[in-house]
Amino acid sequence: MDVYSPTWFGLFMDAIDAAQTAREVEFLARQLPLPRHVRVLDVCCGTGRHAAMLVERGYDVMGIDVNERAIAQARSALAGRATLLIHDMRRIEQLDGSFDLVLMLWQSFGQFDDATNLDVLRQIARKLAPGDRFILDIYHRGFFETRLGTRAHEKLGRTITESKRLADDRLVVELDYGDGTGDRFEWRVFTPDEIAGLARQLGLHEVLRCAEFDEAVSPSPDRARMQLVFEKC
């Protein structure tokens, strides 16, 4: 499983502005109208940036993440307004109860081998009743097929060297922070049809695919991420 370092959080996650999160939550709310979808499971919730805004809108949120630093930050920010647990997504079935909605945002899916990735989806499907929804925000494989190699860029005054390569269907990203530290991440990456087909096997019917958290924007190899909304049959 990928483990995000404190340096990564400081450079990439903590730097996300509230306006971006608000746009993403507006999309989620359009796809999850209250009161039909109230109880939300936010898988890999990170620092709770989506959970906080969803709670403000009246959703009952449980967030899980394996990163203790992220959960501690989320608990501090939400101050008891959501249930936030240090919990592995591979054990979703151990969580109490069911949910009206499961979220998996910010390229959190695909960290494991194909069998384990499928089992994570299977556990999510089992936590949903017919008519409940699952929203997935992941990388579009086509985007990275033409953007591999090594480049250096500036982020918050630091020079980061980023290397990307594809190994079969897996994207490998290595970050060098220039101070002897770095991060390495690896994910199975999909086309829209591939991930929709995988979900279909588990009784999750696709109701929307888009990009930029905008229903009017279609997924494209020109855009790094895509969002898919599934409904339990």
Regions found by a protein language model. Give the residues of each.
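Residues lining the SAM
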Residues: 105-106
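A short acidic, Gly/Pro-enriched loop at the edge of an enzyme's catalytic core
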Residues: 94-101
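Class I SAM-dependent methyltransferase SAM/SAH-binding core
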Residues: 49-91
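C-terminal lobe and adjacent flexible extensions of AdoMet/dcAdoMet transferase-like proteins
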Residues: 194-233
